């Protein structure tokens, strides 16, 4: 089963992934972008080079295609639990050029069975961002991240409606333990 954790920077995805690693020891944990050796190179270029937004979108789509082919599909064939920090949902939300059609091509229509979406309000996001050193995306401000969050929600629910992906939307400001229990129960519902 393919499960993805989604949410804007600062909502606690990495914390939850760490807890899930302790709970689901036999699961394959991966990430997008950069879940393969080639993906790390593409991610580095996309985030650090002065390139057009369109070129950046295609680098991320290339990463997604390689990740699907070399990581996701083999693990699904082995019937493994796959837990990914981000997915095509982030790809569509963060890019102005990344459409569902292009992402379905890149993923060969391999979609997550379950989507966990961590959401946060403006004040909570401001507080979380004030506690960390900010990257290029986080430096664009809370309004930009809240716009991306709305796109994440829209894309996740569109995948639910069109393809039957299950979506669990959680308030990221709940306690780490409460969130972990809800996420683990959602995953275990089928495992």
UniProtKB/Swiss-Prot annotation:
Q: Which UniProt keywords apply?
A: ATP-binding, Kinase, Nucleotide biosynthesis, Nucleotide-binding, Transferase
Look up the EC number in the record and give it. Answer: 2.7.4.9
Which SUPFAM superfamilies did the record assign? P-loop containing nucleoside triphosphate hydrolases (SSF52540)
**Pfam annotation, one family:** Thymidylate_kin
Q: Which reaction does it catalyse?
A: dTMP + ATP = dTDP + ADP
Q: Which GO terms describe its cellular component?
A: cytosol
Query: Which domain of life, per UniProt?
Result: Bacteria
Q: What class of enzyme is it?
A: transferase
The UniProt record gives the binding positions of ATP as: 7-14
List the molecular function annotations (GO) for this entry. Answer: ATP binding; dTMP kinase activity
GO BP term (any one): dTDP biosynthetic process
| Family per similarity comment | Belongs to the thymidylate kinase family.
Protein role: Phosphorylation of dTMP to form dTDP in both de novo and salvage pathways of dTTP synthesis.
What name appears for this protein in its UniProt entry?
Thymidylate kinase
* Gene that specifies this protein: tmk
């Amino acid at each position: 089963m393919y499960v993805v954790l989604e949410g804007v920077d600062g909502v606690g995805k990495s914390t939850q992934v760490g807890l899930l690693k302790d709970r689901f020891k036999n699961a394959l944990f991966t990430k997008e972008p950069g879940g393969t050796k080639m993906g790390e190179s593409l991610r580095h270029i996309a985030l650090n080079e002065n390139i057009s937004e369109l070129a950046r979108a295609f680098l991320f789509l290339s990463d997604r295609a390689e990740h699907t082919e070399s990581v996701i599909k083999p693990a699904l064939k082995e019937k493994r639990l796959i837990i990914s920090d981000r997915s095509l949902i982030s790809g569509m939300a963060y890019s102005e050029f990344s459409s569902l059609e292009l992402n379905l091509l890149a993923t060969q229509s391999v979609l997550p069975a379950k989507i966990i979406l961590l959401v946060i309000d403006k004040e909570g996001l401001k507080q979380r961002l004030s506690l960390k050193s900010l990257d290029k995306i986080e430096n664009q401000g809370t309004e930009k991240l809240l716009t991306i969050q709305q796109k994440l929600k829209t894309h996740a629910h569109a995948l639910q409606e069109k393809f039957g992906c299950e979506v669990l939307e959680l308030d990221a400001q709940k306690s780490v333990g409460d969130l972990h229990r809800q996420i683990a129960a959602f995953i275990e519902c089928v495992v």
